[in-house]
């Protein structure tokens, strides 16, 4: 009896679509979801964010850190 190979569903970018949230450096609640508990930016292969939106997200997180809206490192 041959088993079917495990089919992993392709994740969809959370920032694409009609009612998708806009990436904004002032929206710290949204940005916090894409930062690890150590304060690092989570890679797109884990969050399923597209490459273009991952660059926007990284820039927004870095801008928020510079303006002291987000911490650089978490204790």
Curated annotation (Swiss-Prot):
GO biological process: translation
Keywords: Ribonucleoprotein, Ribosomal protein, RNA-binding, rRNA-binding
Record-annotated disulphide pairs: none
Entry's transmembrane regions: none
Top-level lineage group: Bacteria
GO molecular function, one term: structural constituent of ribosome
Pfam families recorded: Ribosomal_S18
PANTHER family reported in the protein's UniProt record: 30S RIBOSOMAL PROTEIN S18, SMALL RIBOSOMAL SUBUNIT PROTEIN BS18M
Assembly and oligomerization: Part of the 30S ribosomal subunit. Forms a tight heterodimer with protein bS6.
Functional description taken from the UniProt entry: Binds as a heterodimer with protein bS6 to the central domain of the 16S rRNA, where it helps stabilize the platform of the 30S subunit.
Family classification: Belongs to the bacterial ribosomal protein bS18 family.
Protein's name in the database: Small ribosomal subunit protein bS18
Gene from which this protein is expressed: rpsR
